[in-house]
Amino acid sequence: MGQKINPLGFRLGTTQDHHSLWFSQPKNYSESLQEDKKIRDFIKNYVQNNMIKASGAEGIARIYIQKRIDLIQVVIFMGFPKLLIETRPQGIKELQRTLQKEFNFGNQKLNITITRIEKPYGNPNILAEFIAVQLKNRVSFRKAMKKAIELAEQADTKGIQVQIAGRVDGKEIARVEWIREGRVPRQTIRANLDYCSYPVRTIYGVLGVKIWIFLDQAK
């Protein structure tokens, strides 16, 4: 059942790194872990509520959190930072203040920075958001999948696999549809593979979108 494992956790320490970096006492570990989840959810909700409405996607690839004794460093990797910054020039400072109010960090200073991703459509999270917007707008799932693959190919990826599961096109019986282009070596640990699982809420129910992107082979 090797194919059932999460491709990112499978490659930790080889081609993947942890998205959180901190040390904690065993008794405080679960609290710190929950705090990370809450911070990520809060940032995603804030970006969703304050971005340009026409875009329909957050454009967040991942959120990296590093905690020290006196500092909490949050780095937001975004494909389209203009979506947030153009509407509110003081967006980052405002987010920082709101986050500080929401969470009691005590003596720890909070620092938030935004890093732009060069090729946004080479990231599975941003591609999954793109597919979600298409499906919510009643675009055919095949058309949405093919367009996503075209965008990924323009971002110089070696291979991509897109899978949609659930009541596809509103059919009564749930099924799994997938499409692959190029190489996607899911069993090779040295393969630099990026992965994302994304739920899409449609009028027919929840669809599960999964995307595997093969970037490169680790030396």
Swiss-Prot record:
A Pfam family that the UniProt record links to this protein: Ribosomal_S3_C
MF-aspect GO terms: rRNA binding; structural constituent of ribosome
InterPro entries according to UniProt: KH_dom-like_a/b, KH_sf_prok-type, Ribosomal_S3_C_sf, Ribosomal_uS3_bac-typ, Ribosomal_uS3_C, Ribosomal_uS3_CS
GO BP annotation list: translation
Cysteines engaged in disulfide bonds, as pairs: none
Top-rank taxon, per record: Eukaryota
Any Gene Ontology CC annotation: plastid
Cellular location(s): Plastid
Keywords: Plastid, Ribonucleoprotein, Ribosomal protein, RNA-binding, rRNA-binding
Primary subcellular site in the record, as a coarse category: plastid
Cross-referenced PROSITE patterns: RIBOSOMAL_S3 (PS00548)
Domain KH type-2: 43-118
Assembly, per entry: Part of the 30S ribosomal subunit.
HAMAP family according to UniProt: Ribosomal_uS3_B
PANTHER family given in the database record: 30S/40S RIBOSOMAL PROTEIN S3 (PTHR11760), SMALL RIBOSOMAL SUBUNIT PROTEIN US3C (PTHR11760:SF19)
NCBIfam families: rpsC_bact
Family of this protein: Belongs to the universal ribosomal protein uS3 family.
Record protein name field: Small ribosomal subunit protein uS3c
Encoding gene, per UniProt annotation: rps3
